[in-house]
Amino acid sequence: PRAELESIAKLRAEGRDAEADRALDAFRRDHPGYRIDDATWERVKPR
């Protein structure tokens, strides 16, 4: 899961928000119980 979140953060940093949104939706669907720490959430959350 950690690597997936890093990929999503990279998409956000590159301004590819639509792709990041889809990836985050898929991540949450695939890992429903995974708690995203606050620092990571700030990097991956929808904008």
Kindly label every feature range from the protein language model.
Residues 17-18, 22-47:
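Short, charge-rich amphipathic alpha-helical segments embedded
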